[in-house]
């Protein structure tokens, strides 16, 4: 026999919260109390009584009425809240908050009387758009720079460079130095955690170490020893080192210089699967242009999404923002871990707190973008068919088989494909129903302004000269 329908009142609150008032009949309260007492009498162990056979009066004497009532109330709250959600069709985003707090309710709880529960919870917001078509977005036109081909080739040259020993001069910028060092803080002489190393290679380029270190090694000769005075940046990742001055006892053990390979067909074969420099350059140019086109498309999408978000009306609950913040911080930690950084030592409670605070703006922006697209899909009835999903799924699964990838979550893969296909349709709709104005890059705009300014100056000078010319 199912429980009688609960008497429930609901009212909307700001930021997608809902207030719920539930009237719990006295008989439900009494039943919950009796169940709690029976459960405790079966589990409690009291000398002189067999387990499970302790009289209820003895249980009450041993545990006290309040403890039994607390157990009864806790169980009652869980059951009543679950029933309320099901009865009212509420989909909460977080655990409910009791208006008066558990302790206050317990203090006034009488199993013989009706209980009035007042709770609040966050619910999924319903986003709406004031407007979704006829909007104008501005986007900077990305112009392909052929110099990037040369930059990539130079990077490959550096990677394929051979290290040649240097013995007849002091260390210079760009050299590779083999050094040993031991660091300590200047203020108290304490050893710096991770501030010592034996015989490691360091490229003498700015930004490789903390300020003052590279500059100090430059000018040293092999077998020289030197004390370098440095200072940790104020935003350094180790909390105890931030902004502190330090001394490093450094010895230069060896010195080498990079010898770059010649730019010929042999280099092209080493650096790629191409047979000659001409083919290598053509391939790099093609890849860079494709990358430029992808970035341009992404920039267009971002600008369209920005103007759409301005038309969004939605109240985002705090619990959703907090959840998104946690995701951002976790992704940040994963990125550092993939770079080989010890996340446990780096992510101190202070840093995590700071990251969570600074990520709130980004979290809210991401959520507003999601809700804007969700509202667009609903208002324009844009959806993805099963046929489209299955067709794309077959393509992706074929690619996965070719790459020998394992441990693929089929459900998540299908969800990701569905999301991607829906986004493609949404942005295609935005492109078709709105205007994107392409403007020249900032550099080009500055050059145009400069030319325009020069023309005006030249014209003014000519006019001045003309006015000074005597009449005939």
Curated annotation (Swiss-Prot):
* Domain PPIase FKBP-type: residue ranges: 174-261
Q: Supply the Pfam families for this chain.
A: FKBP_C, Trigger_C, Trigger_N
Q: Which keywords, in A-to-Z order, does the entry hold?
A: Cell cycle, Cell division, Chaperone, Cytoplasm, Isomerase, Rotamase
* Chain intervals for the UniProt region annotation (Disordered): 433-472
Q: Name one GO biological process term.
A: chaperone-mediated protein folding
Provide the catalytic activity annotation.
[protein]-peptidylproline (omega=180) = [protein]-peptidylproline (omega=0)
Q: Where is this protein found?
A: Cytoplasm
Molecular function terms from GO: peptidyl-prolyl cis-trans isomerase activity; protein folding chaperone; ribosome binding
Asked if the record carries the keyword Isomerase, the reply is yes
Q: Which InterPro entries match?
A: PPIase_dom_sf (IPR046357), PPIase_FKBP_dom (IPR001179), Trig_fac (IPR005215), Trigger_fac_C (IPR008880), Trigger_fac_C_sf (IPR037041), Trigger_fac_ribosome-bd_bac (IPR008881), Trigger_fac_ribosome-bd_sf (IPR036611), Trigger_fact/SurA_dom_sf (IPR027304)
Give the record's GO CC terms: cytoplasm
Major enzyme class: isomerase
Q: Give a yes or no for keyword Chaperone in this entry.
A: yes
Q: What is its EC number?
A: 5.2.1.8
Q: Where is the composition biased (Basic and acidic residues)?
A: 439-451
Function field = Involved in protein export. Acts as a chaperone by maintaining the newly synthesized protein in an open conformation. Functions as a peptidyl-prolyl cis-trans isomerase.
Q: Which HAMAP family match?
A: Trigger_factor_Tig
> What family does the Swiss-Prot or TrEMBL record give for this protein?
Belongs to the FKBP-type PPIase family. Tig subfamily.
Q: What is known of its domains?
A: Consists of 3 domains; the N-terminus binds the ribosome, the middle domain has PPIase activity, while the C-terminus has intrinsic chaperone activity on its own.
Q: What is this protein called?
A: Trigger factor
Q: Which organism is it from?
A: Prochlorococcus marinus (strain NATL1A)
